[in-house]
């Protein structure tokens, strides 16, 4: 591993190659109601 990053590689990086992606919420926290229902089910 090099101590310093390769700045030439960073500067020559082509941002046009990156694809635009849609961000989606994945791990949303359960509501208090959901937690209570799960506790009742056990």
Curated annotation (Swiss-Prot):
Extent of Basic and acidic residues compositional bias: 1-25, 33-42
SMART domains: THY (SM00152)
Molecular function in Gene Ontology: actin monomer binding
Modified sites of kind N6-acetyllysine: 4, 15, 39
Sequence positions bearing Phosphothreonine: 21, 23, 34
Task of the protein: Plays an important role in the organization of the cytoskeleton. Binds to and sequesters actin monomers (G actin) and therefore inhibits actin polymerization.
Recorded family membership: Belongs to the thymosin beta family.
Matching InterPro entries: Beta-thymosin (IPR001152), Beta-thymosin_sf (IPR038386)
Annotated Pfam families: Thymosin
UniProt keyword terms in alphabetical order: Acetylation, Actin-binding, Cytoplasm, Cytoskeleton, Phosphoprotein
GO BP: actin filament organization
Name of encoding gene: TMSB10
Subcellular location: Cytoplasm, Cytoskeleton
Gene3D superfamilies: Single helix bin
Protein name in UniProt: Thymosin beta-10
Keyword set includes tRNA-binding: no
This protein's GO CC annotations: cytoplasm; cytoskeleton
Residues with the Phosphoserine modification: 12
Ranges for region Disordered: 1-42
Organism, scientific name: Sus scrofa (Pig)
